[in-house]
């Protein structure tokens, strides 16, 4: 998932992985906080 800001990742991460938390690192979303 491409991103510029960490908040760009929140919806896609939740939608695709169910993970509630996300960070944008090197223009790529890192999803975490998954159960």
UniProtKB/Swiss-Prot annotation:
It comes from Hemiscorpius lepturus (Scorpion). The record marks 23 as: Basic residue of the functional dyad. Gene3D superfamilies: Knottin, scorpion toxin-like (3.30.30.10). It is found in: Secreted. The keyword rRNA-binding does not apply. GO terms for cellular component: extracellular region. InterPro entries: Scorpion_toxin-like_sf (IPR036574), Scorpion_toxinS_K_inh (IPR001947). One of its GO terms (biological process) is envenomation resulting in negative regulation of voltage-gated potassium channel activity in another organism. Coiled coil: none annotated. This is Potassium channel toxin alpha-KTx 6.15. Its main location: secreted. Has the structural arrangement of an alpha-helix connected to antiparallel beta-sheets by disulfide bonds (CS-alpha/beta). Blocks voltage-gated potassium channels rKv1.1/KCNA1 (IC(50)=13 nM), rKv1.2/KCNA2 (IC(50)=16 nM) and rKv1.3/KCNA3 (IC(50)=2 nM). It comes from the Eukaryota. Disulfide bonds join 3-24, 9-29, 13-31, 19-34. GO terms for molecular function: potassium channel inhibitor activity; toxin activity. Belongs to the short scorpion toxin superfamily. Potassium channel inhibitor family. Alpha-KTx 06 subfamily. The record marks 32 as: Aromatic residue of the functional dyad. Expressed by the venom gland. Keywords: Disulfide bond, Ion channel impairing toxin, Neurotoxin, Potassium channel impairing toxin, Secreted, Toxin, Voltage-gated potassium channel impairing toxin.
